[in-house]
Regions:
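Extracytoplasmic beta-strand-rich oligomerization domains located immediately C-terminal to a leader/signal peptide
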Residues: 1-113
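Short linear sequence signals and composition-biased patches located at protein termini or domain-edge surfaces
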Residues: 118-186
Length: 186
């Protein structure tokens, strides 16, 4: 339906806007004994109908969406750098899958937790984020692949060793919604 297509378009725009602002905070993890995480952490988790879906957490240089109630944000002093996360979680009390966006106003040592969660939709049945990596073949050609669905920035080695990338070369997003009638929109 038109409303489902519109909802899907808006959800994908929000996720892609955040992912396009993905940041690797080199100075945040500079200390050798630092346990802080930065960059991108993405994994596959169990989703609707026992399918696998993505769960992503990252730092992004975007204005705050969820902290408009903080006076400094209302006065235009948003730091513009936040922890962001997207996931599908089952509300067991209602047996409904909820697509959520997490935003932590301040960056801290734990990239996976904290901040506020907002339910964006209860219609999402597919959320897949894949990453493109360019690799050089033995013949010296560049080969591209979007087959990686898991990413965990190795904070302290990605600048020293070029085979350990801080961030992917490109990101691909695939989402689907299911309407009340069972129709799936992709």
């Amino acid at each position: 339906s038109l409303s489902q297509s519109q909802e899907l378009r808006l959800l994908m725009k929000m996720v892609l806007d955040d992912l396009q602002s993905l940041q690797y905070l080199e100075n945040f993890v500079k200390e050798k004994d630092s346990a802080s995480e930065t960059g991108l952490i993405a994994k596959m988790v169990l989703g609707p109908e026992s399918s696998e879906v993505s769960q992503v957490d990252f730092h992004a240089a975007v204005p705050s969406r969820f902290f408009r109630d903080i006076e400094s944000v209302r006065e235009g002093m948003d730091p513009g750098l936040h922890e962001i996360g997207y996931r599908l979680e089952l509300d067991t009390a209602r047996d409904v899958w909820q697509f959520k966006r997490r935003e932590d106003f301040y960056i801290d040592g734990d990239l996976l937790e904290g901040g506020r969660e907002q339910i964006l939709s209860e219609s999402v049945v597919k959320f897949i984020v894949s990453f493109r990596i360019e690799t050089e073949t033995a013949a010296g050609f560049l080969e591209e692949s979007f087959e990686d669905y898991v990413w965990d920035t190795d904070e302290r080695t990605c600048f020293e060793n070029k085979s350990n990338r801080c961030l992917p070369d490109a990101i691909q997003l695939s989402m689907s919604l299911q309407g009340a009638s069972g129709e799936i929109v992709s």
